[in-house]
Regions:
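Residue-level recognition of tetratricopeptide repeat
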Residues: 6, 15, 40, 49, 74, 83, 92, 125, ...
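TPR alpha-solenoid repeat register
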Residues: 9, 43, 77, 86, ...
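Structural marker of alpha-solenoid helical repeat scaffolds
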Residues: 2-4, 36, 70-74, 112-113, ...
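Canonical positions in the second alpha-helix
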Residues: 32-33, 66-67, 109-110, 142-143, ...
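Register position in tetratricopeptide repeats
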Residues: 19, 53-54, 89-92, 96, ...
């Protein structure tokens, strides 16, 4: 169309928006591409993946199936990784719907060697969701371990299985054993800190996060996690704000870190400022956790109708989000 950027240029712009975590704007660009050139396969894949991450399952499934249809008409080598990505995403959509037979059927279509481990990880997750956690762990442990990257992938997969099953103590111990072999591994330390928090061991969480920050002063996730944890407990709020502002220095504009900053402001009584920050973060990244916080701030400001709208949107994004469910239960609200 005359005067319109080429889809390839618009695709590059969409990827730049994704890199900047401007997801809603990226999605708009992808939708323009698929409307203007419906045979542009890559746009369907990225659009479907993004929609799936936002829990918009029906449009995500449609976009991913359209990608598969287009990709299978083109040379296999051009799309082998993309097809594997699409099959994994379609499997996860089926898994979220508890259609485990369909989830496994999508995984069976993956034949790209580089993605077979990811497929087995998904199979293990499906087993765990069916209450077969021991079987799932055995499947993960049976995977090859030919190099350090594969060993790490297996560890991460097993820890994730245990975390999703809320088996926090065995997951914590598994990471502890790995840290005994690699005591300077800050990624393992960070993951163990997050599990310590789930177990309610907040002093251990803080000790581990401070260890991470000392070893990696630019690790913004550690500043954010510690700051948010303090804010959530209403403790040392000026320090919490300082930690989160430090995280934003390393990751400016990150909507999840902005969410943490807003939560500190809210805890300090700065409700209007908290609402402003959260509105901006939610616009940039519609997410159930951010929706929970934005709704609560609006509720406290007497904007009950707007709060309920945001909470309803949050439930559509992720009905199982713990923060959102806890917020609604605590405030005794049925949006």
């Amino acid at each position: 169309m005359e005067g319109q950027p080429l889809p390839e240029i618009r695709m590059g712009y969409a990827r730049a928006l994704l890199d900047a975590q401007r997801y809603a704007e990226a999605l708009q660009q992808l939708q323009v591409i698929t409307q203007q050139r419906p045979e542009f396969a890559e746009a369907w894949l990225v659009q479907g993946t993004l929609l799936a991450q936002d829990n918009q399952l029906a449009p995500a499934e449609a976009a991913l199936k359209r990608y598969v249809e287009l990709a299978q008409k083109q040379p296999q080598e051009e799309h082998s990784r993309g097809l594997a990505q699409a099959f994994l995403a379609l499997s996860q959509i089926a898994e979220k719907r508890k259609d485990y037979a369909m989830a496994n059927a999508w995984l069976d279509r993956i034949d790209n060697a580089g993605d077979l481990m990811a497929a087995q990880n998904r199979r293990a997750s499906i087993l765990a969701q069916q209450g077969k956690l021991d079987e799932a762990r055995k499947l993960i442990r049976s995977l090859p371990e030919r190099n350090p990257a594969e060993a790490r992938a297996k560890l991460t997969a097993e820890v994730n299985l245990l975390r999703e099953a809320r088996q926090y103590k065995p997951a914590f111990e598994l990471l502890g054993a790995a840290l005994a072999k690699s005591p300077n591994d800050t990624d393992l330390m960070y993951d163990q800190a997050m599990l310590a928090e789930k177990m309610g061991n907040l002093p251990e969480m803080e000790r581990l996060l401070r260890q991470v920050i000392a070893a990696r002063p630019d690790f913004h996730h550690a500043y954010n996690a510690l700051g948010y944890s303090l804010a959530e407990r209403g403790q040392r709020l000026p320090e919490a704000r300082q930690l989160i502002q430090k995280a934003l220095e390393f990751a400016p504009g990150d909507p999840f870190i902005s969410d943490s900053l807003a939560w500190v402001e809210f805890r300090m009584g700065n409700k209007a400022e908290a609402a402003r920050i959260l509105e901006e973060a939610y616009k940039k990244r519609p997410d159930a956790e951010i929706a929970a916080h934005l709704g609560e701030v609006l509720w406290s400001l007497g904007q009950a109708d707007r709060a309920k709208v945001v909470w309803r949107e949050g439930l559509l994004l992720n009905n199982d989000n713990e923060t959102l469910q806890e917020t609604l239960k605590r405030l005794k609200v049925k949006p």
